[in-house]
């Protein structure tokens, strides 16, 4: 701190950065001080608060010391420098004091006087106000300071950006520490000084206001009951937040009837659920000829006009209840932190005609149980499940679910899963405002504010409807396009269908080469029957998929036509706000044109409502009905698509078990007989559709071969001969016969194996397509145990039969071979 070297008067004491005060640029005036615009030596624009009376100087001196302690604290107006001047004794003004602080763009008081906030702040601005005040009170508590005069006039607005959890363009900061008090760390933090604004006082302080002796010595009056900083500051903040949310204070107050406020707050303390008390007329006293009034409790934050989301109404109700009944800055900080940092999702509801910015408050202690489910927060009756559609996903929400966990996207379209949906009631608009010359200034200003509020609220409502139908159109169009894209890719249907054909074909070689085994034949027949059944189901579902795809394509085009056509009224919001006057002459002189502006807003609203609710040609449906039908159609198509997917899975399950049995049988047979895998793959390849004629010939030849072999064996047995290679010999004994059979089998197998490996294969002519067959087998044959190939394996009954089958299955190419 620097002291002027001159000991003569005036004595000037400065601190911090020097500044210049502009006496002709007053910003505001309070009961004890005035605020002017100023600028520091570095060029910063500041607000300079100054006072010259003894009590004012003392109050500002306390405020300067407290602001120094709070330097850098969150959401507290920042201090830059001060100037204290003491005049010579006998001067008209003995001393003056001033200090420079941050220059605010506006105040909460001025914001609440704007016509658009006549019924309360927007939800985003209210949430930021709650969070910023929480941070300010936490900073005061950290430095052991009680503010003791929190109200909307002592909260300043600074430019902000909706980032990092912020929702509005306002940054709120607490100011005016003239009534504040630094508390000792070792003290009980209890206070008895009567200080504060009359209609925001804690009940302990309100009780003192009705004492007739208090008015004579208010500045030195001490309360009978001590109060804490939490009690007085949170009570005043609760009254302020209620006012900012509804446009009215929670308790009736009359300047000349202090007992009215006192009775209201006492009545509230006796009702633990109340957050406000409303004075209502209950009758009339005939003896005294006066009306009888009583206080009625308000147990939930009114939101008829502001249309706050239900999660916010519940949160604010619980918060105000704690302020008035169980004040706790720690609990307030937890709730405020959740309001800023919890997960947020945006839900657009066509039938409710609303866009809800939902914040997940279900995990906040002592608050989550009072938060309604998401379904109820969106305006649906108890027990209504909902379908949520985004640009990328679809989710079903139970009617009791409160958390947004599992919802990855930010924006969703809501489709209630119920046959009957009640539409949200749209408030009727009344623009009949009469401003007459015989009205008082106050009455005229109230009417003008209501008139401008109606016009601005209609514009806000229109903007919400435009945004709603834009989002609905985008989401529905995208969802239908995604469905078309999914249905155009029949991968599951095609894969399962190919599998069914494969099972059918894979059963053939098992029947060809092992017809003598009844068990194997039964498995093959079962596979074939199941495969045919599954293939028929899949073909039917493929057709259903094509129908759904065609329907989705058409509905996607219809969804693009949901957007509303709007009248362009540039700058009308600012123009309406400029016609808010408090002077009688100004109000009467602008009556006609201000009414024209409001009527223009109504015309724009009627144009939008006409598109939403009425058919354009009495043939086509209205935008609202079309949007609801499209949403329901999308839900139904999605349901049909899910059933289709489930049926495909059932078809695959139907095929899997018998096919696995057949596959195991084939593998066991191959292992037992020692047949080569290459032979199996060749027969599988031969069973492809392009070799259909060859397949028929093989089947016929196989049956003929079996008959010929059986007949030949019978005749040889009757004649008593045994075939040894190309030689028939007489069977001399049973032992000789057995030996002959073994030699015969060995020679036949050896003979045919040499024929297969020999380059000269004229003895066994091949079918016309054998050259193509062999090349394709070598290039792309697959294993029976890997991904299903297009044809099944070849398995012979035994080596002798296999050799004979290969011999007789091939057509003869020359007479010599036939004779042989």
Curated annotation (Swiss-Prot):
It is found in: Cytoplasm. Expressed in oocytes. It is an enzyme of class 2 (transferase). Residues 21-299 form the Protein kinase domain. Residues 758-798 are annotated as: Disordered. Keywords: ATP-binding, Autophagy, Cytoplasm, Kinase, Nucleotide-binding, Serine/threonine-protein kinase, Transferase. The active site is at residue 149. Pfam families: Pkinase. Disruption phenotype: RNAi-mediated knockdown results in defective clearance of paternal mitochondria and impaired accumulation of the autophagosome marker lgg-1 in 1-cell stage embryos. It catalyses: L-seryl-[protein] + ATP = O-phospho-L-seryl-[protein] + ADP + H(+); L-threonyl-[protein] + ATP = O-phospho-L-threonyl-[protein] + ADP + H(+). Transmembrane segments: none annotated. Its main location: cytoplasm. It comes from the Eukaryota. The keyword Cytoplasm applies. ATP binds at residues 27-35, 49. Belongs to the protein kinase superfamily. Ser/Thr protein kinase family. This is Inhibitor of nuclear factor kappa-B kinase epsilon subunit homolog 1. The gene is ikke-1.
